[in-house]
Amino acid sequence: MAWYYHVIEQDDHRWLCRHGRRVFDRHLVLADAIAHITDLAAANEPAEVFVHRLDDGVECLHAQP
C-alpha cells in the first residue's frame, strides 16, 4: 500500500503540504514545498507525491512500486 502526499497550490499562490487530512505547512515557493514533502514521503515509503495546480493540473513526482 502506498502513502499519498500532496503539494497543493492555494488561491494566494502559496503551496500547501498535505497527507490525507493532515496539513503540514505552507510554502511561498513550490520548490521548497516539493523538497519538504519529498523528504516526508521518503521516510514513509512506499509513497507517491502529487502536485495539484490551480489550473486543475496534477503531476506525480515520486512513485514507488
Q: How would you describe each model-predicted region?
A:
Residues G20, V29, A63:
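Surface loops and adjacent helix of pleckstrin homology
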Residues L28-E45:
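A short, charged, amphipathic alpha-helix used as a generic interaction element across diverse proteins
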Residues D25-R26, C60:
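A sequence-level detector of short linear motifs
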Residues A43-P65:
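Short, mixed-charge low-complexity intrinsically disordered segments
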